[in-house]
Amino acid sequence: PPSGGKQLSKEEIEIIGNWIASGSSPAQSVAELKLDENLKSYFFMTKTNFFPDVKILAVDFEKIKELKSQKIFVSPINKSSNFLSVSTINKKDFNDKDIDKLLEIKDNIVTIDFSKSSITDSIFLRLSEFPNLTVLRLTDTKVRGEGIEKLSVLENLKRINLVNTEFDTAFLKSLTQFKSLEKIYLF
């Protein structure tokens, strides 16, 4: 295992093996690795009863294909669910207006990773329209926190990651209004 760390999981070892087999390019995106669906779901691991307990229709595959062509990674959270995880990690220029591309599938999205994107506080109003959003990652963005209270209407939001943001501590109190929030990552 890494010094002072935990042993890599079987999935992590397999992902690294795929990366090495495909040429080990540090610029290669997750989407370019062409991982098996079981390995893709590793990036969006779930625990029982973590996500909303509602039945939801599947999203048209053509819509997912369209988003992927725009470097927006979309994947089911597992094989038996119509819920989706969305990541813009490969689209650094994803901005506040680009969220409109996700509105058509907003009911299916439970996890969004906007890390290292170009979003700002303006995103909070639109995100408040995603009823099943459970995990929100805003790591390494320009988010300051103004308007974050708009997310308090999201009854399923359990985790927010605000690591390496410009989050202003004046907005911390707003987070106490969130009924389901279990964890906030902020440093």
At which residue positions do the language-model features occur?
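Short secondary-structure junctions
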Residues: K71-I77
